[in-house]
């Protein structure tokens, strides 16, 4: 028998279960493999004397602990559980360790220092010591080491006052105790040691307690990063303290209070309480359990009992869990990406920083193998460029681990050249370059010297010879190719002479050479650019893009070759003729920007050549340069306006609180915080932040930081979020943040807006106050505070890593972009300025949101009022902008108007802004132009008439067509704006006069007030009349114009008396309007507005109307409006409603419409008193009004050239002929809403037929009369006839509508013999007048024309035959189409486009699935994908036995043939034997050579189902669905995402679910239900016994006889049942479906010829695979639906298909 040596390491491995249990009791876990590695390698390499075989010596253990507990990156937190367990075995040894403990050593006497020596205090690895200023003192220890230090429950805690006894006289051997063994050695003097010891069992098994010292707590806090900065490091420190010291509840609180802030401590405790386990081990929500396990107040735990220590151990574990939970930060991969390798940083150091970033900013552990891929990618792409490029080029990079990459990176790093080597290399390269250049220069100088020496001789030799010719791209100076001499960089240049042209917009240096003359400076996109005028250039050229480039390119041919250059996008160019949009060529190689012929044409430039050179002028001969001056006078442009600045400085000094420049951000102290009310149904909206360009982000970042510093913004966490949009300020590079609050505005309650209307705001400004002060409040909305409950509504995302911001910000003040902000601020400012208005009643203060206008009668009053206003604003917390202030001036700009001497003008800036608008190119730009110009319509006479051609282009859905008319209107508006006059301010103390004129449906007027003997214009008014009023006679149109303009003028007059002056005496017309033209509602409205005697007066008619600006004829055109309206007739002057005495015909008309059998039927009739003149049915759905119109129109048409009296009982038809017809015609057959009137075609036909009779009288008679009068008899007969006609067959539509409006004459139709045969069958009658055959009121169309019509109709619509039939029946064609249904079917079936696109309509009967004859013989297999994949498992391989339905499912990480073969050989074959048949789809894993080879070797018949036909694998596909659905339900129930763990439960369910025959797969296989234990049954003795083997075999035999054999017979019976096959046979032409179609690609391809067929699939030519019958459709009609023009079956030229004896061959033949 051999003997083995037992070491401490082998001893622990032999008792490993006890070692692991001891570690678990201490709250840690240890691993056996790592235990061996640490003992044999890691701790040995620490060089502290640790032996390879291990030791239980406390000295060695303490030395290892110092290394492991070292602070910062030098420690080893992962090794703390292992060394702690070693110490536990040494200090509290079990029985199998005691024989191996080292003998106790006598303590070495401590030497006494002769004199106090100053020494720097040293800190331990875990418990650093504070330096002390007191003299060294010996440690306070009890005299007897065996005596207890402290009784935890009876004695007071330390420190204790102790004396300084003499040192021990000699060594003595003390009795070792656990406390003494735990005293750690210090590297400093013993007098300066600070001990912090854990709670341990001392003598007599009493717990001894030493609290933490102040120095330990201080050093832990000062030598470790705070929790917010590095939570991982601090958590590891606290974990080591909890493990090694085992502190009490009070010590834990003291430790948390010292190392964490209040907020962090609260978060840790909250996270810890969430992890308190319940009875089932899961986190509980019971408050009593939580308070008992993790109390917030000091508990009454007795640490001398096991229960108390167990409470404390669980408390420490929960505290660690809380620390880790609170340490989790939101994932911020952007912070990880910012960790890049430094220039001189080693790859190892960089990797450590990268891992630390992963721990700090992500919840992922970089040491986790699952995260290795992301860490590797970050390590590669964030390395320095040289290392990154070489790592990316490594072969087989996907197989490298992180350690492999680190080694490669270290190799690359070590091979780097040093800075000295790099400098040496660059110096050598520069030296070689200089040598080469010097050599070339030497050759050049030698050549020059030689040429100068022999100049005369060479000239004589050369004679008349020319110089050496240069290349087309060769420089004549340096002889290099690629440029010309004028662009040669080596050519010396003369200093440019001083230019007399100053380019104010040049953004380059002051000494830059301008382009040569002639040159012009234009503004491109707001930036000035100086161009060289080049008439030879077809297009203008820019050398700098200054914006995005388009994808359009142009080939530029130059002297040195040709090259493609890109165009810029459309830029706005300011020309002398206005602003246009233009696209430039971007040619960076061009020396100067070129002004080509394209822009010169738009500029209308003129070039004059004089003795001084070329001169470029504008269209009127004026120079195009704006400013020319000498350079020595340039300084005058920058001289400050000293007077105005000094005055402003005085105001800033006297009122510092009123200005934003001196008072800072204001706050309205008198206003309560604004509370926003949400709608009742509002829910939070969260919209992600849009991607923001870097330039824009940098532009708004200073503004965000400024508002954060001012407290306008603050960080928050809100369920609301809206995006932030950076908007670039025009003409600058600055951006301002604008928040998109549209979604928030939708969810906020609307309030009534009380903001003043700028249209009439200045009406309250009296002309008697000519001194003005204008103040613009700065950041006005930010002066109002926002309630804390409403602040979260306006949150937005913002990230600023430089200041540590990553999250949401929100506004603490009223934000801009909120829909109610203007109203809320306007009301708040009004209330704050109410006291000012009361104190200064003589002043006029106008307020438009944040724009204030103060008007006074004198300058003194204006100064005093301005001072008081500034003081009020400053006291209330508002701030005005000193930059925009206009103080005590007689001419100011307010709301875009210039105010002076009681008048207002349009500002020059506003005119220039409108004049610079380029020609619109879409509807949106037209609306923008009309909106901008419409703001100035008060200054433009007849603006509505000028802009009339532009308004139709603004309607949605209208095709944008910019023509000459629109261009003229566009230019006329700009011209009218240039000549806009000055308008007087409305004086509400004086009466107003309104001159009105109307022309072609446009109302124009001038509102004036008297100024001495003159009439001063106040406003020019214009508007277009509505559609109804536009159709009235001129006098009534004038009434409508007066009503519209009086309403608009009321906004300016504010209810003051108004006198109306027109050229029509309309007052009598208003008082007695005609009933024929006006409705009662409109008549009442006009009278209520215009007959207000207190406000509206009608003046005398005038002959000079300022509205038209044209003199009227002398004396005017005086007329009586009532008389003119009375003389206004309808379309026919002699039309009357009285019977004609000499009438040739007296007829009665009527139309009937009613619903019968769910369908509306209609008819019309014309009769006399006793006989029917005409009657016809009308199309289904015809209304009664339409029928009346048709009947009356037919009567007028038949009475052509005769005197007719016609009676109708329709008010609608009677009013149309006498009144409304003329009104409809005048207004363009439009309703008052601008829509087309109903029955438009019938009304037009009726108005045209009114002129056919010689004389006409249309009389209205009551309907359904009783009596014997002629009118009653005729009306009853017409009514009965119309009803009778409606009940006749109405499949043939009436021809009246098309006959009433005759189109162009067509040539007569020619009927062939087949058409005449059809005519005879239909018994149609011939119409000799038109030369056509008529059938049921319809004209029979020849068949060839009918087929052509249907063919063209199908080509236009590509509708189906049924749809086209419905379309033809609904339309009133008036034609009978012979064989319509046949032609419709033929055309649709022969359309190739429809065949390639339309879906097939092949229906099949129920299929029969082939199954196995017994279990295990026939399987189906398939892969299914399940996301999200857990632990790399993303696929599930499913096998199903087709006989029993038994399923097997295996998780897989990859969908490969290797997985299929592995599971087939290792799982299916050992359990169920070799399958006979295996079915699957055409997936790559199944058609792979590996899978097929395995099946061939095992003798398995592997059947591949049809492609793109999941039904072929229906059984396994249905099982996939069942498994997925059950997994989804279980994950919802359990809350677990690990579907692999839940898979056994799913398989149990599907194996015990009854199938079609009521049996479960388990019962089919085993003959009984699965065994189940009733856990709630007290008697379980019945489950303890099991049947014998013979009983099992007998049961299986019964299963085979009673279940499996009948089941196989049932399957066989289904297979033998005949199935109706598909209708395709060999030789047919079919279309084949494309399963993956591209955009606008046909759905079907072909046609193909069928070669072979099976009951379910086909083989066609040109396609290798078999195709399922559901994936094809017939390419032409079947045999029973052959086209009439197709060749017959006996056609000798037709191919025939015959079968042969060989089933794989067919015979094709054709007769000759």
UniProtKB/Swiss-Prot annotation:
It comes from the Viruses. Belongs to the retroviral Pol polyprotein family. Residues 497-512 have a biased composition (Polar residues). PANTHER family: GAG_P30 DOMAIN-CONTAINING PROTEIN. Residues 416-434, 1276-1287 have a biased composition (Basic and acidic residues). A lipid is attached at residue 2 (N-myristoyl glycine). The RT polymerase active site binds 2 magnesium ions. Binds 1 magnesium ion for ribonuclease H (RNase H) activity. Residues 529-599 form the Peptidase A2 domain. Gene3D superfamilies: 1.10.340.70, 2.30.30.850, 3.10.20.370, 3.30.70.270, Acid Proteases, Gamma-retroviral matrix domain, HIV Type 1 Reverse Transcriptase, subunit A, domain 1, Human Immunodeficiency Virus Type 1 Capsid Protein. The gene is pol. The active site is at 534 (protease). Mg(2+) 2 binds at residues 1150, 1188, 1209, 1279. This is Gag-Pol polyprotein. Keywords: Aspartyl protease, Capsid protein, DNA integration, DNA recombination, DNA-binding, DNA-directed DNA polymerase, Endonuclease, Host cell membrane, Host cytoplasm, Host endosome, Host membrane, Host-virus interaction, Hydrolase, Lipoprotein, Magnesium, Membrane, Metal-binding, Multifunctional enzyme, Myristate, Nuclease, Nucleotidyltransferase, Phosphoprotein, Protease, RNA-binding, RNA-directed DNA polymerase, Transferase, Viral genome integration, Viral matrix protein, Viral nucleoprotein, Virion, Virus entry into host cell, Zinc, Zinc-finger. Its cofactor is Mg(2+). Its EC number is 3.4.23.-, 2.7.7.49, 2.7.7.7, 3.1.26.4. Mg(2+) 3 binds at residues 1422, 1481. A zinc finger (CCHC-type) spans 473-490. Residues 120-132 have a biased composition (Low complexity). GO terms for cellular component: host cell late endosome membrane; host cell plasma membrane; host multivesicular body; membrane; viral nucleocapsid. A zinc finger (HHCC-type) spans 1354-1394. The keyword Zinc-finger applies.
């Amino acid at each position: 028998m051999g003997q083995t040596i037992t070491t401490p390491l082998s001893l622990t491995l032999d008792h490993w279960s006890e070692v692991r249990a001891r570690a678990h009791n201490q709250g840690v876990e240890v691993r056996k493999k790592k235990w061996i590695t640490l003992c044999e390698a890691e701790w040995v390499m620490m060089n502290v004397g640790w032996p390879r075989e291990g030791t239980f010596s406390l000295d060695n253990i303490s030395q290892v602990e110092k290394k492991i507990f070292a602070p910062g990156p030098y420690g080893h937190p992962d090794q703390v559980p292992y060394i702690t367990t070693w110490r536990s075995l040494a200090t509290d040894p079990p029985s199998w360790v005691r024989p191996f403990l080292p003998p106790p050593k006598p303590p070495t006497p401590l030497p006494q220092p002769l004199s106090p020596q100053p020494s720097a205090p040293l800190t331990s690895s875990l418990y650093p010591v504070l330096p002390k200023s007191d003299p060294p003192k010996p440690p306070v220890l009890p005299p007897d080491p065996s005596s207890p230090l402290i009784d935890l429950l009876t004695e007071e805690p330390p420190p204790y006052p102790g004396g300084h006894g003499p040192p021990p006289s000699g060594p003595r051997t003390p009795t070792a105790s656990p406390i003494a063994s735990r005293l750690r050695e210090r590297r400093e003097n013993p007098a300066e040691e600070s001990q912090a010891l854990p709670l341990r069992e001392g003598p007599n098994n009493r717990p001894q307690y030493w609290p933490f010292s102040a120095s330990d707590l201080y050093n832990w806090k000062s030598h470790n990063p705070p929790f917010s900065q590095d939570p991982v490091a601090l958590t590891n420190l606290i974990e080591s303290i909890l493990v090694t010291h085992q502190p009490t509840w009070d010590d834990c609180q003291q430790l948390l209070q010292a190392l964490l802030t209040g907020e962090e401590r609260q978060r840790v405790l909250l996270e810890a309480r969430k992890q308190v386990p319940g009875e089932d081990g899961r986190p509980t929500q019971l408050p009593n359990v939580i308070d008992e396990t993790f109390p917030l107040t000091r508990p009454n735990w007795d640490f001398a009992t096991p229960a108390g220590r167990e409470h404390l151990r669980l408390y420490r574990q929960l505290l660690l869990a809380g620390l880790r939970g609170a340490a989790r930060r939101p994932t911020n991969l952007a912070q990880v990406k910012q960790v890049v390798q430094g220039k001189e940083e080693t790859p190892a150091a960089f990797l450590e920083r990268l891992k630390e970033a992963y721990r700090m900013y992500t919840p992922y552990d970089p040491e986790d193998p699952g995260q290795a891929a992301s860490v590797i990618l970050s390590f590669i792409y964030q390395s320095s460029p040289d290392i990154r490029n070489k790592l990316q080029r490594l072969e087989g990079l996907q197989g490298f681990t992180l350690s492999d990459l680190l080694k490669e990176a270290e190799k690359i790093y070590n091979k780097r050249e040093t800075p000295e080597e790099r400098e040496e290399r660059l110096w050598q390269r520069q030296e070689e370059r200089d040598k080469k250049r010097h050599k070339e220069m030497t050759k050049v100088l030698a050549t020059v010297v030689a040429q100068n020496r022999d100049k005369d001789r060479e000239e004589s030799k050369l004679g008349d010879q020319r110089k050496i010719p240069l290349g087309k791209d060769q420089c004549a100076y340096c002889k290099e190719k690629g440029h010309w001499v004028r662009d040669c960089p080596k050519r010396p240049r003369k200093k440019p002479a001083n230019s007399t042209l100053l380019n104010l917009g040049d953004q380059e240096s002051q000494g830059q050479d301008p382009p040569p003359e002639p040159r012009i400076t234009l503004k491109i996109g707001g930036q000035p650019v100086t161009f060289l005028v080049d008439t030879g250039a077809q297009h203008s050229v820019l050398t700098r893009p200054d914006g995005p480039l388009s994808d359009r390119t142009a080939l530029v041919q130059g002297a040195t070759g040709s090259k493609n250059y890109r165009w810029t996008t459309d830029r706005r160019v300011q020309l002398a003729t206005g602003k246009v949009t233009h696209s430039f060529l971007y040619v960076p190689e061009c020396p100067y920007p070129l002004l080509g012929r394209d822009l010169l044409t738009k500029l209308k430039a003129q070039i004059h050549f004089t003795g001084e050179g070329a001169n470029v002028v504008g269209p009127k001969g004026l120079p195009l340069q704006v400013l020319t001056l000498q350079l020595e006078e340039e300084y005058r442009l920058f001289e400050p306006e000293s007077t105005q600045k000094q005055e402003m400085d005085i105001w800033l000094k006297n009122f510092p609180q009123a200005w934003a420049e001196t008072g800072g951000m204001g706050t309205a102290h008198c206003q309560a915080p604004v509370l926003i009310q949400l709608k009742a149904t509002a829910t939070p909206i969260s919209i992600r932040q849009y991607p923001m360009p870097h330039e824009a982000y940098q532009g708004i970042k200073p503004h965000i930081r400024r508002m954060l510093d001012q407290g306008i913004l603050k960080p928050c966490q809100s369920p609301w979020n809206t995006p932030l949009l950076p908007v670039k300020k025009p003409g600058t590079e600055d951006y301002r943040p604008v928040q998109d609050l549209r979604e928030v505005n939708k969810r906020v309650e609307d309030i009534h807006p009380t903001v003043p209307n700028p249209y009439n705001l200045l009406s309250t400004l009296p002309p008697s106050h000519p001194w003005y002060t204008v103040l613009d409040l700065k950041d006005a909305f930010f002066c109002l505070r926002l309630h804390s409950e409403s602040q979260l509504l306006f949150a937005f995302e913002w990230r600023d890593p430089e200041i540590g911001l990553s999250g949401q910000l929100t506004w603490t003040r009223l934000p801009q972009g909120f829909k109610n902000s203007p109203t809320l601020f306007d009301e708040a400012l009004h209330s704050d300025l109410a006291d000012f208005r009361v104190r200064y009643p003589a002043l006029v203060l106008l307020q438009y949101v944040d724009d204030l206008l103060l008007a006074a009668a004198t300058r003194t009053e204006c100064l005093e009022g301005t001072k008081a206003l500034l003081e009020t604003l400053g006291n209330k917390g508002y701030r005005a902008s000193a930059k925009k202030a206009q103080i005590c001036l007689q001419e100011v700009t307010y709301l875009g108007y210039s105010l002076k001497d009681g008048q207002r003008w349009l500002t020059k800036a506003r005119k220039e802004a409108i004049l610079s608008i380029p020609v619109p190119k879409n509807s949106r730009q037209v609306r923008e132009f009309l909106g901008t110009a419409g703001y100035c319509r008060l200054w433009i006479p007849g603006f509505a008439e000028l802009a009339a051609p532009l308004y139709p282009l603004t309607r949605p859905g209208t095709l944008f067509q910019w023509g000459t008319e629109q261009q003229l209107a566009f230019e006329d508006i700009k011209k009218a704006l240039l000549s806009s006059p000055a308008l007087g301010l409305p004086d509400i103390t004086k009466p107003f006069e309104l001159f009105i004129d109307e022309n072609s449906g446009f109302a124009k007027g001038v509102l004036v007030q008297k100024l001495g003997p003159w009439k001063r214009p106040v406003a020019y008014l214009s508007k277009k009349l509505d559609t109804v009023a536009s159709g009235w006679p001129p006098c009534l149109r004038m009434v409508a114009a007066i009503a519209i303009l009086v309403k608009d003028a009321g906004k300016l007059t504010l209810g003051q008396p108004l006198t109306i002056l027109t050229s029509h005496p309309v007052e009598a017309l208003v008082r007695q309007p005609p009933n024929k033209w006006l409705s009662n509602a409109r008549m009442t409205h006009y009278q209520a507005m215009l007959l207000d005697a207190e406000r509206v007066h009608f003046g005398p008619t005038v002959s000079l109307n300022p509205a038209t600006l044209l003199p009227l004829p002398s004396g005017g055109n005086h007329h009586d409006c009532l008389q003119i309206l009375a003389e206004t007739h309808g379309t026919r002057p002699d039309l009357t409603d009285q019977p004609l005495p000499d009438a040739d015909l007296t007829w009665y008309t009527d139309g009937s419409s009613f619903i019968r059998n769910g369908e509306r039927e209609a008819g019309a009739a014309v009769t006399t008193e006793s006989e029917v003149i005409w009657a016809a049915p009308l199309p289904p759905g015809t209304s009664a009004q339409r029928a009346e119109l048709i009947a009356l129109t037919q009567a007028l048409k038949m009475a052509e050239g005769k005197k007719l009296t016609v009676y109708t009982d329709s008010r609608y038809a009677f009013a149309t002929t006498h009144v409304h017809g003329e009104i409809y015609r005048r207004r363009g057959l439009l309703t008052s809403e601008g829509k087309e009137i109903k029955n438009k075609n019938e009304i037009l036909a009726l108005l045209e037929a009114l002129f056919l009779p010689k004389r006409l009288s249309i009389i209205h008679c009551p309907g359904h009369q009783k009596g014997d009068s002629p009118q009653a008899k005729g009306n009853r007969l017409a009514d009965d006839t119309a009803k009778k006609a409606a009940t006749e067959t109405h499949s043939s539509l009436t021809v009246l509508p098309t006959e009433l409006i005759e189109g162009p004459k067509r040539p007569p139709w020619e009927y062939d013999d087949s058409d005449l045969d059809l005519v005879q069958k239909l018994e149609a009658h011939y119409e000799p007048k038109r030369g056509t055959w008529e059938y049921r009121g319809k004209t029979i169309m020849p068949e060839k024309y009918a087929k052509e019509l249907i063919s063209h109709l199908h080509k236009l619509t590509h509708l189906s035959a049924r749809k086209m039939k419905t379309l033809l029946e609904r339309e009133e064609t008036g034609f009978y189409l012979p064989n319509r249904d046949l032609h419709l079917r033929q055309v649709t079936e022969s359309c190739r486009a429809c065949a390639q696109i339309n879906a097939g309509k092949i229906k099949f009967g129920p299929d029969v699935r082939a199954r196995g004859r017994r279990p295990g013989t026939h399987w189906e297999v398939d892969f299914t994908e399940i996301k999200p994949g857990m632990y790399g498992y993303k696929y599930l391989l499913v096998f199903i036995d087709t006989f029993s339905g038994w399923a097997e499912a295996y998780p897989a990480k990859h969908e490969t043939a290797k997985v299929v073969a592995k599971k087939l050989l290792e799982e299916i074959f050992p359990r169920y034997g070799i399958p006979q048949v295996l079915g699957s789809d055409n997936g790559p894993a199944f058609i792979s050579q590996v899978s097929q080879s395995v099946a061939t070797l095992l003798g398995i018949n592997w059947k591949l189902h049809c492609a793109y036909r999941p039904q072929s694998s229906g059984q396994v596909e249905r099982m996939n669905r069942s498994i997925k659905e059950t997994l989804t339900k279980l994950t919802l129930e359990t809350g677990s995402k690990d579907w692999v763990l839940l898979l056994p439960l799913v398989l149990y369910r599907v194996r015990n679910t009854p199938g079609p025959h009521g049996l479960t797969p388990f019962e089919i296989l085993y003959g009984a239900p699965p065994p189940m234990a009733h856990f709630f049954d007290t008697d379980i003795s019945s489950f303890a016994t099991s049947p014998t083997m013979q009983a099992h075999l007998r049961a299986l035999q019964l299963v085979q006889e009673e279940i499996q054999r009948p089941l196989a017979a049932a399957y066989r019976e289904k297979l033998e049942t005949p199935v109706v096959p598909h209708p395709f046979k060999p030789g047919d032409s079919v279309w084949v479906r494309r399963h993956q179609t591209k955009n606008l690609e046909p759905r079907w391809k072909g046609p193909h010829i069928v070669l072979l067929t099976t009951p379910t699939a086909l083989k066609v030519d040109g396609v290798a695979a078999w195709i399922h019958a559901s994936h094809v459709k017939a390419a032409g009609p079947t045999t029973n639906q052959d086209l009439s023009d197709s060749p017959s079956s006996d056609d000798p030229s037709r191919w025939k298909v015959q079968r042969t004896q060989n089933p794989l061959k067919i015979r094709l033949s054709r007769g000759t």
